[in-house]
Amino acid sequence: MAKKKKQKTIKLDAEIKGILFITIGVLSLISIMSSSNSGIIGKMSKKILVFIFGLGAFIFPFFIIFVGVCLILKKGKVTYSGKFYGIVLFILNTLFCLHIGDIVTKGLDRSFFQGIVDIYNSETFLHGGVISYIVDLPLYKLFGKWGTFVIFISIYVICFILISQISLYSIISKFKLKKEKRRKEKNIEIKEDVQDEVKFTEIKDSEEIPEEKIINRIKIIDFIKNTNIEENDDTKENKPIQKGKDSNNIQGEKDINKELEEEMSKAALKTIDYEFPSIDLLNDNKSIKLKKEDKKELLNNANKLEETLTSFGVEAKVTQVTKGPSVTRFELQPSVGVKVSKIVHLADDIALNLAAQDVRIEAPIPGKSAVGIEVPNRELTPVYLKEVLDSNEFKNCNKNLAFAIGKDIAGNCVVSDLSKMPHLLIAGATGSGKSVCINTLIISLIYKYSPEDVKLLMVDPKVVELNIYNDIPHLLIPVVTEPKKAAGALYWAVNEMTRRYKLFAETNVRNIESYNELLKKGKGVEKLPLIVIVIDELADLMMVCPNDIEDYIGRLAQMARAAGMHLVIATQRPSVDVITGVIKANIPSRISFAVSSQIDSRTILDMGGAEKLLGKGDMLFYPSGESKPMRVQGAFISEEEVEKVVGFIKEKQCGEVEYEDSIIDEINTSIEINNEDRDELLEEAIKIVVDVDQASTSLLQRKLRIGYNRAARIMDQMEERGIISQKDGSKPRQVLISKDDIV
């Protein structure tokens, strides 16, 4: 109670003081404005105020009223800022300047007291009062006229700093930046087909960014590049699938198509009758470049990022902002002594301050002394397959199995060579972009290679994904949709691999490239095409016949590269029971789309990160030989575009497609054998008889610990498969295969 009573008393005292100050101020104002009606006290107060302050007497009443109002509003707790003291000093300095003229005019002949008397008897207001006289006279005697003016000017500069709260350093820096900008604007020549760059100084008028941050220079790169570029003669001399850079000139496109047709006709003389599809069958990208508002937003986010890190004690500067199709990467330059791990641990705090869905940190960026912070864009910009196929990266790629992947964050087209991988594993959740990626790979091969150079063996347990490619000349056999037939197709692939190695041994060559070179030298050998085996859903195959599929894939992955056979395996369930150790160890190149958990990401990439991807083609591309995966926005191709390309190929081919009947017969034979009552111990029994090089029912009974009837059935099954010889009286059966023949 006592405390409340004391607080109430303090409040009342402050209000009383405030009212007294306001009253004195109003009376002073009346006395100065109208001395005839202000009484004796009014006339005296006017004389005293004019004597003390001179012209400042008109300001003094307002100052007293202001103090009174502050006492009432602030409850007696009045504190004055630097701006207040700056205003008071400005008024006093103005009075000093006003009065120095009187001292200069009358000189130093009169005495000090005579000067005070002259001020008191003065009938004009145009002087600074006795206060100004007491200050100006010593200054004038010590420093003279010009020295006194220099002091007054310095005081005005101090007043400006106190009132505006702006440092002289920032003003000078701002002037330098403006001068530098004008100089650069005179020297910069505007060009097309360059990455869009802007300096931080371009938005100096923005209220959202502090002026102190303007000193930092941030480079902004937009991944969308201008495509209105004239073609030169070098870009026109390419393969049939290649066209020059995009142009709005229709006549130019017609000329390109004519050249493409001429080159395709030349290629047809050397190969089978195959007409390459036109690039015009694919859709154009109509995305627009960055707007000025988008650039300002990126720079504001860069500023927020620096402030967030500073608040956690991490000193770092943003040196470059790169806007990609799906994410924007902020490149940070940490100060000396800052641990990279400290920045990585702040991922959630950075996402919170930038209002981002999620943040992925790449520390450090390969090849740069910087840390990359990848923030998702508000709107995802698609990358169309036509852009990548029409790029110099794809057109100038002379690899055996070049295919388009997409664009990286900087907007560079990513093209890879399947023959160097040599096998590819693709994983991602439903809807993340796996099927589109497979279509992109297949269409890329169709655009760049003829059926004589590349053959495709497709396995599609989902039935609906790859059936559209039936009846194109690149296929060895129709798309395989039954899981058991898929095992038979892989079994044929293993046999084909073995056959090719035998051919290599006979001709003393080591790989398919050397073997096909013999044909160019005039030696009578058959040309062996490269074979790409595409499996769209591995998980479904592993559920039906896991042992066979794993064994076949493992054998192909280990040995098929030199034979010109390459695997592309996709699955939406990257778990350890689908991507087994054997498969994972032999397929070093991986593409991971968005997955549901970090465990799945580690299964496919051996590291986290895929769980933070955005879907819709956002991927981590991890080719063999690289230390870290690369973030890429996958090229998009619609079903309509696939239908156009496939329809064009079917329309232009002569006659019906001739499939390899021998492959189909071999697959059907293996299916018939597998459809019988196959014992689950058959494989183990085969290994036993091959190891001991003899086969008998009693041997299987002892080794497998089974009864006579089951052992006899296993013996019959091995006989049907040609593993052991037929029964010949009392003679022991012969084992017809060796350890090398076991698949």
From Swiss-Prot:
Where it sits in the cell: the answer is: Cell membrane
Please indicate the ranges of residues that lie on the Cytoplasmic side. Answer: 167-743
- Alphabetical keyword list: ATP-binding, Cell cycle, Cell division, Cell membrane, Chromosome partition, DNA-binding, Membrane, Nucleotide-binding, Transmembrane, Transmembrane helix
Residues where ATP binds: 431-436
Note the InterPro entries from the entry. AAA+_ATPase, FtsK/SpoIIIE/SftA, FtsK_alpha, FtsK_dom, Ftsk_gamma, P-loop_NTPase, WH-like_DNA-bd_sf, WH_DNA-bd_sf
Annotated GO biological process: cell division; chromosome segregation
Question: GO CC terms for this protein?
Answer: plasma membrane
Q: CDD domains of this UniProt entry?
A: TrwB_TraG_TraD_VirD4
The highest taxon in the source lineage is: Bacteria
- The reply on keyword Cell inner membrane is no
Q: Which GO terms describe its molecular function?
A: ATP binding; ATP hydrolysis activity; DNA binding
* Domain observations: Consists of an N-terminal domain, which is sufficient for the localization to the septal ring and is required for cell division, followed by a linker domain, and a C-terminal domain, which forms the translocation motor involved in chromosome segregation. The C-terminal domain can be further subdivided into alpha, beta and gamma subdomains. The alpha and beta subdomains form the DNA pump, and the gamma subdomain is a regulatory subdomain.
So what does this one do?
Essential cell division protein that coordinates cell division and chromosome segregation. The N-terminus is involved in assembly of the cell-division machinery. The C-terminus functions as a DNA motor that moves dsDNA in an ATP-dependent manner towards the dif recombination site, which is located within the replication terminus region. Required for activation of the Xer recombinase, allowing activation of chromosome unlinking by recombination.
Subunit text:
Homohexamer. Forms a ring that surrounds DNA.
Q: What name has this protein been given in UniProt? A: DNA translocase FtsK
- Its gene name is ftsK
